Amino acid sequence: MAKMTTIKMKRLLEDRLKNPEYRIVYKRDDDALRIEWRDSGQGMTVSLPNLITKYNNRGDIAIQEMEEHIIEALKIMNETHHLQGMEKHIFPVLRSPSFPIETKAGKKLIYKDHTAETRVFYALDLGKSYRLIDEELLKEEEWTLDRLDEIASFNVRSLSHEVKKDQVADNDFYFLATQDGYDASRILNEAFLEEMKANAQGELTVAVPHQDVLIIADIQNKMGYDILAQMTMKFFAEGRIPITSLSFVYEDRKLEPIFILAKNKPEK
């Protein structure tokens, strides 16, 4: 594989994204490429060093994926979206409290607090991608937050919740990873958590390290907490959209963060 440089990557993207309606600007100070619509100025900025790292690890597929992501993102920015008639395509998504509450265009996103470690935003599913719902869109449709939340909550309950089980040191770990974009969102399905709680032999704990996984653990001994902590940290570090490296105890229909040092102390 030939060594990839910033200039080579810049030219490669410019060639792949040729479109008379796009404006492509190289931002030398940031070592980034800005791709935007000529008429509206809406667009996205790509860090060239980050893309080169992905290319070095994965080859041409990394560039192909970035090209598809840019085209899809710009397409969404240029479309008019409605909530009415799209009720079945509205879902809640979990994010960390540090996630921006405004878009780069200055639109305020709709969200509600979930736990000290998580917030719930709302997504309009568009097939290959989704758009986070903002105040302006909600106002245009004359919807309330309560109505939006009710619809999103209903839809997340309709998603499958088949899990894969793994037993480690007499503790049961269940993984939900369908890759549909809403794996972590299933933590909001209270009926599902209640079912898991009813069948648990020990303490039921839950983790959402990143958007594409939900971990449920039936902890039956002290070593289980240590395993869960290490597991959650690993998933958090690898996640495309990380949420939290902490896990939660599920008790009395509430989620309480548990602070675990990844160190197993033997009982005296």
Swiss-Prot record:
Under Pfam families, the record lists: DUF1444 (PF07285)
Q: Family assignment?
A: Belongs to the UPF0354 family.
Q: What protein am I looking at?
A: UPF0354 protein OB2234
